[in-house]
Amino acid sequence: MKRFFNEACDINTPDKSGVNENKLCFPPLKVVCQAPETTVKGQVANTNKHNVYSTKNSMYLLGFEEILNTVLDCEPHIFTDDELRVIENFKALDSDERYLFVRLFMRKRNKWFRVGHLTYPDCKDVIACCKQLVLKNFFEDESLMSTEEIIEILSLDELRSLARQTKVCGKSRSEISKEIIFLSKRQSVLHCNGQQFLSFDAFGVMHKQESFLRKQLLYQCKSCVKPKKILVDLFHRINIVYFRSSIYDEQSLTSLILARLNKFSYPNYVLSRTSNVFNCRAQCLEYVEVLELSKNLVPIFENTAASDKEALEQALNSFFEIYPIWSTYLNEDIREFWVEENRKVDTRLVRFSFSFRPGAVYTYLIHKSLNILAKSRLVEVEHEILDTLLSQNIYLVGKRGHWYNRKALLEYNFKTEDTNVLRYWKTLALSTCENGIEDKYTHLRYYFSLQRRLVRLRKCLKVSNTTELKSMKLINNNPSRLFLHGERIHNGDLSNRTVWRSKTNNAITVEELALQHYQSIGWEGIHAESSILLTLFALTFWDILFEDVPGVFQSPFQSAPLDLHTDSFYISRESTIMKRLEEIRNGKAGLIIKDNYIREHQRKTFCVGLNWSYTCEMLLEIVDCINDNGLAQIFLALTQDYKNSSSGIPDLCLWNPSKKKFMFSEVKSDNDRLSEAQKFWISLLISSEVDVEVCHVSMHKKK
């Protein structure tokens, strides 16, 4: 199935067998949710509903049309009359023509396709369909291709053949392409015998070499087509509206098709497709535009090195370009948000709808640009931006703890020779830490760093601890450490994964080597990383995950609410989450897990993070060994920031049923260091009185 999907969609999909990915899946139309039908004799009947006998019932076409119909039914106000006519024209196409358009639309954007290389068995006549789609203005043909675009789609063998004909030097694709493009700009024509001469048309006008070369290039590649950009943009916008995308993702439709290739059973929840996420067409266009902008800018803001002065300057220019736009959107959105709040509208729906405003994406870009300001050492600008971000609480409220922490660091490190000014800034840093710890939106993952900084500042300023802050629990975050030695195998693998020799002389990973040691001293365990905790979380919070919250279930095929990876998940369900955490502290987690497991296991219901390969007995055994308060704290971190807290969980999950003991172990080989996410989890586990240790594995010392 994976191979078929890769070939169909031209993407490289890594093998994700095992744990479900933390992403939503939306297949279209019907999905078989019941057990297989049986014949009279009790034999399993043929339940394959996905056999494609023509393009009319193709899963690609049916899924695409389901998206179109849903968006047009719910949100027609975001399209112009011309756009609606285009969509109607698309619906009027022959089924083979619609099918071919959808298949090429799903492939790489702005790519030319050689008609002779398109092989779709379900389509009766691909060549005829391409011609019709060109005539009906859905495709562009090779007449609009540039020389560079033609060269790009030719194979290396074809380029080498052309190079021999035109006496062009070069062996690699880049060398030959460069020489051909250079040659095309010359006015003299080079014929196959290597002789150069000037060429004139019937009217005595001199030809350029480019015209001659284009003919040769087009002779090699034959007919080519690609979907028109204006149509691709329109249908991608419809995709974004349908999937309620908060990131720019051109593969949403392919995810939908992948889900349709399987017979998934989805959880029961109340479907609430909203029609007012985008108030008007202009807002939708602005949102899609800034999503595409973020796709380009986020990698620049994240990856630009401080040593690359030119790239850093370009990144700064991008920041200063978007800053005034962000400021305008932010001020407008704050005013409108509070107007909506005062209208007694459901706050949960207000927060959900505001996450699809251009201001939400611009705020995310500004948050990412803090990295560039730090590398550029623009301390005053960064400090001002942090103040502005903290002055609002409608966008990225889950990042407030990070902003407090960074702001306190800038204030603590303020450089001056004046001791009074220095004390002022350190006092300001102290106040920032206190505000951060007291802020109800500060997540657990930021508490520990704020607490440690607060202690250092109090000591530096010689301030007495007169009033204890809420939730203030200072902890020693140094885990116990175990040192093991083993024999490392040099397997020539270029990856960073180390390979070790087991007791039975097999090649194993460093985690498996550590697990063998723990099992030898009485522990049961698995190398699970986040898998066990995410499975326990899904089963414990099932009813809360699929609670009827306005706007978060917009498709009948979701494995999680749309807001799970956002700040809104915790805010919109705070009361029910806190009630569930109290039940967990009172020892009821096992009963909740057992009830949900028994109810959903037969259908293998598709839920985010849930791995049905674990038995109910094993999960209950693990829960019975973890202290109830520790389990509640672990789940609190996941409810506050599921996306980021899903990473960094220690490698090994270990338990001893007879002694009712549980422990996590993070395994490190030589020169491997703890990441920030791993440090957070270790701090959280220690503060929650859940045993955790770091297991260092190194090679045997040579005698």
Swiss-Prot record:
Effect noted on mutating residue 103 to A: Hypersensitivity to a cross-linking agent
Cofactors (names): Mn(2+); Mg(2+)
Nucleus recorded as keyword: yes
Outcome when changing residue 666 to Q: Hypersensitivity to a cross-linking agent
Catalytically driven reaction(s): Hydrolytically removes 5'-nucleotides successively from the 3'-hydroxy termini of 3'-hydroxy-terminated oligonucleotides
Cellular localisation: Nucleus
Enzyme Commission no: 3.1.4.1
Family: Belongs to the FAN1 family.
Protein name: Fanconi-associated nuclease 1 homolog
